[in-house]
Amino acid sequence: MSIASVASVFKGEHAVGSTVTVRGWVRTRRDSKAGISFLAVYDGSCFNPIQGVVPNSLENYDNEVLKLTAGCSVIVTGEIVESPGAGQAYELQVTQVEVTGWVEDPDTYPMAAKRHSIEHLRELAHLRPRTNIIGAVARVRNCLSQAIHRFYHENGFVWVSTPLITASDCEGAGEMFRVSTLDMENLPRTSDGKVDYDKDFFGKEAFLTVSGQLNGETYACALSKIYTFGPTFRAENSNTSRHLAEFWMVEPEVAFATLSDIANLAEGMLKYAFNAVLAERMDDLQFFAQHVDKTVIERLQSFVSSDFAQVDYTDAVEILQKCGREFEFPVSWGIDLSSEHERYLAEEHFKAPVVVKNYPKDIKAFYMRLNEDGKTVAAMDVLAPGIGEIIGGSQREERLDVLDMRLEEMDLNKEDYWWYRDLRRYGTVPHAGFGLGFERLVSYVTGVSNIRDVIPFPRAPRTANF
């Protein structure tokens, strides 16, 4: 007996005429008057289920096979034959069906209905991977993850695991989740009435990280090329389709690199990842094109064949001001570009992915390198047609005196960043990096517009079930 995934059967990895065993769940059962049942069995290895043709001669046909409903788990053994019907190349002539798990009450099984709204599925996050759409999202998400790791490995990067618990606020925004073991009902106090964090687990205030970047820089300044890939947290009270409180970030950091270098790195990484999805997950992409967003395949193909445009922030503002479009948010030099501005640039003006660079210093973080004009920093955003910003990055400020000045300007205590400042005191180097919000990438590739539907268990304001 050979255990086979549904995907391996469809790929022709098992000879026609060979006997295999497929383990999975029933999607549908259809009975014919000729005493044959057709079971659609899926195991999650690919989009389509495999059809099993079950004769009524099986010993358990009447008392088990005819009672199978959507969601029942089965182990099906049979001979691979070429399928006479359209839609799939192979099917199984079943010789044995073992039922490993029944659905207790098929009438109340939440996934029994043919179609649920995506909003309703969020309330059933523990069962929604069984649906076509969330299963397809999971496979694409995995494909993108693996491709990103391969890309960095093939380009000589070291994967660094940065801490999830930190005392540093990378963005200087203060929107952080506190980590504490103090008794909330009986908080220790200092003499002036403030919470005494000396008595806490770490002996100081601690938070969930908003970014692995600062820690990543320490390793880039020793190993030259590193990347992080892990969860980050923002206590941002935003109930939108674009925000999560817990999400994953890809953050490369490169020593001796300029803003131009990481713009090229971002382009290479995105094209590598998108090409992987086009090559490996076309079955899922075809589903998304049919049921979610008809442009997904064409959009990815266009992306990987396009050269990235580049434009200075100042020039981008001028383009937006002169385009004749009335935007909801008026455009002026010094504002942070909104999604409508970003999408106009990528979709209508350049009609290609675009790198906007050299932003005003007052709207960017303290660690971004100050340009010679004293007004802008060496920062960039990568804007993609169909979604807007997908990557944000910068050349880092490697000059200690300028870094200290920026910390002071932003009312940040430089003593809190003593270790980060040490990198500038001991063999400082120009270096640069960027951050990619991974869920936003999955959303772009699948066309699934709400970011809560491209992560297994979304965390958002007042949403922490499961």
UniProtKB/Swiss-Prot annotation:
The GO terms this record gives for MF are: asparagine-tRNA ligase activity; ATP binding; nucleic acid binding
**Xref: InterPro entries:** Aa-tRNA-synt_II, aa-tRNA-synth_II, aa-tRNA-synth_II/BPL/LPL, Asn-tRNA-ligase, Asp/Asn-tRNA-synth_IIb, NA-bd_OB-fold, NA-bd_OB_tRNA
Give the record's family classification: Belongs to the class-II aminoacyl-tRNA synthetase family.
Check the record and name the Pfam families matching this protein.
Answer: tRNA-synt_2, tRNA_anti-codon
Q: Which domain of life, per UniProt? A: Bacteria
Query: Which HAMAP family does UniProt cross-reference here?
Result: Asn_tRNA_synth
Top enzyme class, one word, equals ligase
Protein name in the entry: Asparagine--tRNA ligase
- EC number, UniProt record: 6.1.1.22
Provide GO CC annotations from the record.
Answer: cytoplasm
Oligomer status and interactors: Homodimer.
Residue ranges of coiled coil? none
Query: What is the catalytic activity of this protein?
Result: tRNA(Asn) + L-asparagine + ATP = L-asparaginyl-tRNA(Asn) + AMP + diphosphate + H(+)
Keyword terms: Aminoacyl-tRNA synthetase, ATP-binding, Cytoplasm, Ligase, Nucleotide-binding, Protein biosynthesis
User: Where's it found, cell-wise?
Assistant: Cytoplasm
* GO terms of biological process kind: asparaginyl-tRNA aminoacylation
